[in-house]
């Protein structure tokens, strides 16, 4: 797995897909990314503050889901969804979904599509993965400058430069090498700002 940068912008989807295809990007698949906010059920009249977490589902990982809660991110089996429904201790409050198209372009994989919240499009999601960072010699976290140049130089213009490095220190249990857990952190932070 390479290093990923995930962001949204308020432009038009056809413009972005034309840029990707002009650069030589080949559309290889479509899918969805689903992020649901769950709140703990507390008794009526209780002074307890309900705990919350986000649950992420990726079509590309049909057997896995990712849970983001406070300072912890966990990869679990997809059965977690049915367990939540059966136990009835948490209630799904809202869901944000991205309907993505996946493009391959040399050492890059680009996923792009509308972000939908309550039937309203809230922006365009862009995920850019630099796959050459997955080699053991290169730390994925050292690829941020190249990723920034690729995004801002080829996919823009954007009103502000796109941030490609992220502070993962709030999640001390994350592995040292970039993983799907880091990607889930980026998605939850993005979807929080959209809702």
Curated annotation (Swiss-Prot):
Question: GO cellular-component terms in the record?
Answer: mediator complex
Query: What's the family?
Result: Belongs to the Mediator complex subunit 20 family.
Q: This chain belongs to which protein, by name?
A: Putative mediator of RNA polymerase II transcription subunit 20
UniProt KW Nucleus keyword: yes
InterPro entries per the UniProt record, alphabetical: Mediator_Med20 (IPR013921)
Q: What organism is listed for this UniProt entry?
A: Dictyostelium discoideum (Social amoeba)
Membrane-spanning parts: none
Q: What is its main location?
A: nucleus
Alphabetically ordered keywords of this record: Activator, Nucleus, Transcription, Transcription regulation
Pfam families found in the cross-reference section:
Med20 (PF08612)
Q: How does it assemble?
A: Component of the Mediator complex.
Biological process GO annotation list?
A: regulation of transcription by RNA polymerase II; transcription by RNA polymerase II
Function field? Component of the Mediator complex, a coactivator involved in the regulated transcription of nearly all RNA polymerase II-dependent genes. Mediator functions as a bridge to convey information from gene-specific regulatory proteins to the basal RNA polymerase II transcription machinery. Mediator is recruited to promoters by direct interactions with regulatory proteins and serves as a scaffold for the assembly of a functional preinitiation complex with RNA polymerase II and the general transcription factors.
What the entry lists under PANTHER family is as follows: MEDIATOR OF RNA POLYMERASE II TRANSCRIPTION SUBUNIT 20, UBIQUITIN SPECIFIC PROTEASE HOMOLOG 49
Query: What GO molecular function annotation could you give as one example from this UniProt entry?
Result: transcription coactivator activity
Q: Where in the cell is it found?
A: Nucleus
- The signal peptide, as residue positions, is none
